[in-house]
């Protein structure tokens, strides 16, 4: 799935518009396939998780605004996709947002930790990440997973409204500001994943800086 989404992102313009991510009704994302992780095939598990971590890095650093329309439960990697987006809208309902890795016998690697620290509010980070607390949709705003909650029938209407508004933000100035804000986090993520450092285009001198 991560490889498929990565391929789709190749066709998304990165110099105009905005990126809107959503899931199916009742489920935004449940994260990695635990059966793949638990079936005892280390190669398959490593390939799947590495592709997922690279996808998170790509969404987090996408040059245009990223809007997440959480259509239901956002669990494990799904919770971290919310952390990658620039504006997060959740559908009201009996849904949870939970980073449940430590409850499932999994440690959380550096790339995900860095993303979570940049989005989860400090007074909720231990509860949300280390203690794997499940948050209701309404409580997810206070934790830092979501920015806004709306009725389910209004989710895509609101998401498109926000996406259209943020699409008007100037390029490359939005990208330049985002790059500077994320530089330290992305450097730690790319070092952990063995990815090359991404140069940053200076808005003043128009040169690339690393």
Positions of the model-derived regions?
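A structural preference for short, pocket-lining loop segments at secondary-structure junctions
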Residues: 2-40, 58-68, 87, 91-95
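C-terminal long alpha-helix characteristic of the crotonase
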Residues: 3, 90-95, 143-192
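Hydrophobic/aromatic residues within transmembrane alpha-helices
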Residues: 21, 33, 81-83, 140, ...
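A short acidic, glycine-rich active-site loop
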Residues: 39-50
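CoA-thioester-processing core
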Residues: 55, 75-128, 162
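Acidic, divalent-metal-coordinating active-site segment for phosphoryl/phosphodiester hydrolysis
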Residues: 76, 132-139
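Well-ordered beta-strand positions
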Residues: 87, 127, 131-133, 148, ...
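Intrinsically disordered, low-complexity segments enriched in small/flexible residues
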Residues: 180-210
């Amino acid at each position: 799935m991560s490889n498929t989404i990565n391929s789709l992102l190749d066709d998304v313009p990165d110099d105009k518009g905005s990126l809107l991510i959503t899931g199916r009704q009742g489920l935004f994302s449940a994260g990695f396939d635990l059966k793949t992780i638990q079936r005892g095939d280390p190669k398959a598990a490593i390939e799947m998780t590495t592709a997922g971590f690279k996808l998170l890095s790509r969404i987090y650093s996408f040059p245009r605004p990223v809007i997440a329309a959480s259509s239901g439960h956002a669990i494990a990697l799904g919770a971290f996709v919310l952390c990658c987006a620039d504006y997060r809208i959740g559908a009201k309902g009996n849904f949870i947002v939970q980073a449940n890795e430590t409850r499932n016998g999994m440690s959380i690697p550096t790339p995900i930790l860095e993303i979570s620290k940049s989005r989860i509010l400090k007074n909720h980070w231990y509860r949300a990440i280390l203690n794997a607390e499940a948050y209701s949709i309404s409580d997810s705003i206070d934790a830092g997973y979501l920015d806004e909650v709306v009725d389910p029938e209004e989710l895509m209407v609101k998401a498109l409204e926000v996406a259209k508004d943020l699409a008007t933000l100037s390029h490359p100035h939005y990208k330049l500001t985002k790059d500077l804000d994320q530089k330290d986090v992305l450097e730690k993520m790319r070092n952990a994943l063995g990815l090359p450092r991404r140069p940053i285009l200076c808005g003043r001198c128009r040169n690339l800086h690393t």
